[in-house]
Amino acid sequence: MIKPRTPPGIMELLPREQIAFQRMLDVIRRNYERFGFLPVETPVFELSDVLLTKSGGETERQVYFVQSTGALANAAAAADAGGENGGLPELALRFDLTVPLARYVAEHEHELSFPFRRYQMQRVYRGERAQRGRFREFYQCDIDVIGKDALSIRYDAEVLAVIHAVFAELGIGDFKVQLNNRKLLRGFFHAQGVVDAEQQALVLREVDKLDKRSAEDVRATLMGPDFGLAEDAVRRILDFAKIRSVSHADALDKIDWVVNEVQSRSGGNEDLHAGADDLREVLELVKALGVPESAYCLNFSIARGLDYYTGTVYETTLTDHPQIGSICSGGRYESLASHYTKSKLPGVGISIGLTRLFWQLREAGLIQGIAESSVQAMVALMDETRLDDALDIARRLRIGGINTEVQMEPKKVGKQFQYAARAGIRFVVLAGDDELARGVVAVKDLVREQQFDVARDELASTLQVELEQARAMLVAGGVQGD
């Protein structure tokens, strides 16, 4: 007999946790749609040459390839015969949603309306080294706005407003969207003598590690043989990376201070001024969108490690749980699909890694206030002769919007109560001879441990009221129900 087990790096949930996870998905989807984003799904596997066109190194080593048993047999036979095995398998599982989006937009470019606003919430796969909190299969929940030839900076502000709406409704605690601009970073580094674009990208990666490594470690790296930066330049870079704003007005002041500081030393440069102008406009529009200033700040150490970001960058953290790290990140890029089309397709987007976020919230005890079951009521079967009545009551409840289960075989009432309690079902509906003769049913509320009679025709509306009251009480307790 084979021992039942799952591979490492998989998060498999019991029903109660799956309900909580699903409700988080629903909150994210609902807010994406409120802002006018359209759903897209792409295949779980793509053609290998399409998926890997711009990857390499670590990414390619983490890709899962897909091969049929027939193809495997043919490859093995070819190898046994001393021939070539044909190279990489034809298909590979997606490792993120960005590359499939690039392929999708390039392939359907002439069928889409631009700016194209898309959301995508699907599993992705990476061959991560097995360790606690790292997953090989995980959900990503992405939005992107894609332009044709150009895309207004105003969308960068709207994306931040989406982040705020999502996490405000999730109710998992105070959070902060941290904001920066890669152009401003490049301009600042240029003023410190880091002129080469490739070296700037490497310095950006080091600055982006400041939340994981000490400033002294980063200082030593930047002054070491790989970078060889002067001590004064490194000091100014690290001082710059410490800058945080505490209010909307302070953020604008900090931008002006950085620009003036660089101008006084080197006269400024185009990237610095362009990045500063973009940040100012984003901040003013974020305010106009109604995002409270307590929910966002400037953080000049935010760089995002991916090189394709060219402007605004975001990282979101939980204020009371900084150890969780970034719970949502993204930014602006200038050419989404340059490997698939000659068209220029700039965009801005963010991604929520929901599987890792859910796991961390569960570990921190922040997944609260969730019903144990998606079933809201159970109709008990008192005896065989009342099956038709039980089915009719269940039908009426479902029409009234109540998720309802029916006991299909008569059992002792105590056993039916026990089953409902273990399954996390709140209401048990009893329809015996006495109740039916009076035109009512009895309802047992297993949460309040109360029993009451309700007219048969008013059962669904009565339970709806009870459930709405329960939802209202849970709003402050964690992720909200539907």
Swiss-Prot record:
Known partners and oligomeric status: Homodimer.
InterPro entries on file: aa-tRNA-synth_II (IPR006195), aa-tRNA-synth_II/BPL/LPL (IPR045864), Anticodon-bd (IPR004154), Anticodon-bd_dom_sf (IPR036621), His-tRNA-ligase (IPR015807), HisRS-like_core (IPR041715), HisRS/HisZ (IPR004516), HisRS_anticodon (IPR033656)
Stated family: Belongs to the class-II aminoacyl-tRNA synthetase family.
Coiled-coil stretches noted in the UniProt entry, renumbered to this chain: none
Family matches, as SUPFAM superfamilies: Class II aaRS ABD-related, Class II aaRS and biotin synthetases
CDD domains reported for this sequence: HisRS-like_core, HisRS_anticodon
Protein name: Histidine--tRNA ligase
An MF annotation (GO) of this entry: ATP binding
GO biological process: histidyl-tRNA aminoacylation
Keyword Protein biosynthesis: yes
Listed EC numbers: 6.1.1.21
Keywords: Aminoacyl-tRNA synthetase, ATP-binding, Cytoplasm, Ligase, Nucleotide-binding, Protein biosynthesis
Pfam family, any one: tRNA-synt_His
Cell membrane recorded as keyword: no
Major localization listed first in the record, in broad terms: cytoplasm
Places the protein is found: Cytoplasm
Gene Ontology CC annotation, any one: cytoplasm
Segments traversing the membrane: none
Class of enzymatic activity (EC top level): ligase
Organism: Xanthomonas euvesicatoria pv. vesicatoria (strain 85-10)
Disulphide bond pairs: none
